[in-house]
Amino acid sequence: RSLVDAHVCVDPRISVSEGHRIAEVTRKRVLESHSSVSDVLVHIDVEDDLDHDSKSQNTPDRSDLIRQLAPVLSQLPEPQRVVLHYLGGRVEAEVYLSRQDFGDSAAGRGVEQAIGRYLAENPLVSSLAINHRRQIFPVRD
């Protein structure tokens, strides 16, 4: 009997739950198609592990990054959520606001300028996206 350790590279924009689903499907397929395999451990990665591990060792954690983003975030209404992507030794931030909180185009231009200055001064953050949601529909049970 064998134990299998597999690494599957995926698009960095998939959700955590989709990554988990890919891992479960991969595990099931290997077990069903190889009777000599007793168990499979599937790692879902967005980058090559060796490259990712060496580049991401010096990136700050979420709380530190949110503090670093404070100069920009303080100019916005309270975000509904902030999503951080650790890619290539840098960080991409997605900030989600409701549409009604951020409809003024003059305010939008001011924030765009602040984001441009922030990115120029902070090379760790490779991009910062501000997303507007018109409405969040409730989850049905």
Kindly give the residue locations of the regions a language model identified.
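Peripheral (non-transmembrane) domains and long loops of multi-pass membrane proteins
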Residues: 1-141
